[in-house]
Amino acid sequence: MRVWLASLFLCALVANSEGGSELEASDESNCGCQNGGVCVSYKYFSSIRRCSCPKKFKGEHCEIDTSKTCYHGNGQSYRGKANTDTKGRPCLAWNSPAVLQQTYNAHRSDALSLGLGKHNYCRNPDNQRRPWCYVQIGLKQFVQECMVQDCSLSKKPSSTVDQQGFQCGQKALRPRFKIVGGEFTVVENQPWFAAIYLKNKGGSPPSFKCGGSLISPCWVASATHCFVNQPKKEEYVVYLGQSKRNSYNPGEMKFEVEQLILHEDFSDETLAFHNDIALLKIRTSTGQCAQPSRTIQTICLPPRFGDAPFGSDCEITGFGQESATDYFYPKDLKMSVVKIISHEQCKQPHYYGSEINYKMLCAADPEWKTDSCSGDSGGPLICNIDGRPTLSGIVSWGSGCAEKNKPGVYTRVSYFLNWIQSHIGEENGLAF
């Protein structure tokens, strides 16, 4: 009872002090107030000091800026309240037991200067690309970039290109246009690669369906033949930043398909697929489009009717089978190099004859040892045009895999630029 009365008396004194009886402490260093906060003590308890924060700031030291909804630069000075990663998963508090085992936590001697404290707000204490936090995934804690916007992107874009901070065709790793044959790779080599999965019932993991390419922050280009038998957008989920299929990849983003557009003149009545192009509009569960990162980037579109010269080396990427006799798709992303073949050669009778038209591109390994195969459908054919990686083709069809005189056939993207723009619109972030 005495304890309760004492507590009540203390609360009354504190309440009274809030009404105007607070006194400024003579030594503000004892509080460590930031952002214009004033160190104050109570009239009857002068040894108890705290920070009185200006409007818009809160926290023990007024270190949290409640008005900040975006970050500047790389966000090292960000002190806002974003507290989820790019997939909407909650951040761990910097003073939580799990985080205390990590390098950056609230118990560091420099925690206050780094923005760390008794909260779970996103920070960038180690000068990374953007604000991040620790997220619990299974039994482990992972560093995850946060769902918070770059302030420079909140301004109205000056053009239709690069409106989300992307730089099309830019890789985190050095370009690899000289490899011979296929090899397993990481998505940093093809950061525009999109993995499209078909949802399964009963809670089982989704099944890999096709590849695609991120052509703007909200749009993925793929092949119509991937979806004609199951055209409902709700049946698909799209991942960016995946190096391993059906596995968690740090930095990956998951999207629902908001809109699925199949080409109205698609035809598969013969061996060939005609007008084999599709567009998927993607959004996260929180309504976000793709965010640029080391593993996620857009790919440049080609000039109108501008294609790589015949004989050019181009890259193909996917989770497709390594041969026509394989039953399972590989777990790791694979990249190969093929050469563009002329229409005249590809239309030869011992190639594909009259099945080839001007809306298609042919490409193959001169040794016929590597090729796109089942499971690579919809994925990118990336060629160097005017010094930058460009989406020249979309994996469409072919006879077998790496068969002699049977090159892979790709949708010629430069022919379909008007179709793409007519469906996406002008303010789209496309880069040509």
Curated annotation (Swiss-Prot):
Family matches, as CDD domains: KR (cd00108), Tryp_SPc (cd00190)
Molecular function GO terms recorded: peptidase activity; serine-type endopeptidase activity
Major place of residence: secreted
Record-listed Phosphoserine modification sites: 158
Signal sequence, renumbered to the chain: 1-19
The keyword Heme appears for this protein: no
Protein name per Swiss-Prot or TrEMBL: Urokinase-type plasminogen activator
Source species of the chain: Rattus norvegicus
Highest classification ranks of the organism: Eukaryota, Metazoa, Chordata, Craniata, Vertebrata
Gene: Plau
